UniProtKB/Swiss-Prot annotation:
Protein name per its UniProtKB record: DNA replication and repair protein RecF
Entry-linked HAMAP family: RecF (MF_00365)
Superkingdom of origin organism: Bacteria
Gene encoding the protein: recF
Keyword field contains DNA damage: yes
């Protein structure tokens, strides 16, 4: 798989750009702040419908405009597929697949498969659990686009149940059986959708675990063994062995957990049980990585998580596009060599760099210079092949 054409309109610092790309390696080169990362961000948005840098879409729209357009033509086993995404301010986003408007944005997920390596990846190890949950959900969605609907359904139920809990906490309606019956309905829905999301995550972690261990040893030979596991907000024994076929068990456990913690949830007005509170645990040896790993170990583990994702996508039968956003500048020589070795086998690698010396020696790559110029609407990014 590779991206043959890539176009932007009013995305971040770009008023417009059209790039013809080829298999192999392309380096987007230029000083920091010129808009290189914005290119990678747009490609990642085409993969996951989300940015790796911000949690909302509004910052993606160039200042002074009302919408951004991201267009890609993806070639997969000789067949082309065009994706056009319209990111709008004040109304719903829209997507086209092969120029035809689709009913929902999620229909384009999975057309472009990519793995992103970025400086923000350090948060996978050192940051909040939400970063690690998002890593799992993004990968699960790229591999199985139907998971996007599962996530959306769960998030919707979670918002509605949380709103009900807050109203109950404020109004103290606990003696109103009708209101409590309504909460029972939302408990059932949360358990149903939550079990489906948990099952997908647990199955994914079981597949990722051996790949993470291998990738970490490649990056840090002789170091402590890296391991990952899924820790639920419920006390489920042997959860590492729970797969998608155990959805009924997970649903029953979620319902039991919601019942047990109902009084506390009513007191606090928040939902305390469900996959939105689960954790992907990362360990080096017998210690948790967060708080105990060195800076170098943390980087190695973060890259190992991305390499593991890359290997799973390859095993699915489609070679993913590798997106490397200034990561060589963050790594020491040994880790650079290890990552470069993996990248050499990829069908397409798109790299950003502010310094030529950060790119591995001997790489045969097309270089594209990214610069800034003045326009009537302010400074905008441009490319010089």
């Amino acid at each position: 798989m590779y991206v043959r054409h890539f176009g932007l309109r009013d995305f971040r610092s770009w008023d417009h750009v059209d790039l013809e790309l080829n298999p192999g390696r392309t380096v987007f080169f230029g000083p920091n702040g010129n808009g290189k990362t914005n290119l990678i961000e747009a490609l990642w948005y085409s993969t996951t419908l989300s940015s790796h840098r911000v949690g909302t879409d509004i910052p993606l729209i160039r200042a002074g405009t009302i919408r951004a357009i991201v267009s890609t033509i993806v070639v997969n086993e000789g067949r082309e597929c065009a994706i056009d995404l319209e990111i709008a301010a004040g109304r719903a986003n829209r997507a086209r697949l092969n120029r035809s408007l689709v009913r929902g944005m999620r229909e384009v997920v999975g057309v472009l498969r990519a793995v992103l390596f970025a400086p923000e990846d350090l948060a996978l190890v050192c940051g909040d659990p939400a970063n690690r949950r998002r890593y799992l959900d993004d990968l699960a969605t790229v591999r199985q686009p139907v998971i996007a609907a599962v996530r959306a359904d769960y998030d919707k139920v979670l918002r509605q149940r949380t709103a009900l809990l807050k109203s109950l906490a404020a109004a103290r309606y606990r003696s109103d059986q009708g209101v409590l019956d309504t909460l029972d309905v939302w408990d059932t829905r949360l358990a149903e959708h939550g079990a489906e999301l948990m099952a997908a995550r647990i199955d994914l972690v079981n597949q990722l675990a051996p790949e993470v261990e291998k990738a970490y040893q490649l990056l840090a030979p002789g170091s402590r063994t890296a391991s990952i596991s899924y820790r639920a907000s419920l006390d489920i024994g042997g959860i590492a062995g729970v797969g998608s076929s155990d959805r009924a068990l997970l649903q029953a456990d979620l319902l039991a957990g919601l019942s047990t913690r109902r009084n506390v949830e009513l007191e606090r007005g928040i939902c305390l049980v469900g996959p939105h509170r689960d954790e992907l645990e990362l360990r080096l040896g017998d210690q948790p990585a967060k708080g105990f790993a060195s800076h170098g170990e943390s980087w190695s583990l973060a890259i190992a998580l991305r390499l593991a994702a890359y290997e799973l996508l390859r095993a699915d039968g489609n070679e993913p596009v590798l997106l490397l956003d200034d990561v060589f500048a963050e790594l020491d020589a040994a880790r650079c060599r290890a990552l470069a070795t993996v990248a050499e086998s990829a069908e397409q690698v798109l790299v950003t760099s502010a310094a030529q010396e950060d790119i591995p020696v001997g790489w045969d790559a097309k270089w594209v210079t990214v610069d800034l110029r003045d326009s009537d609407s302010g400074r905008v990014s441009v490319v010089y092949p």
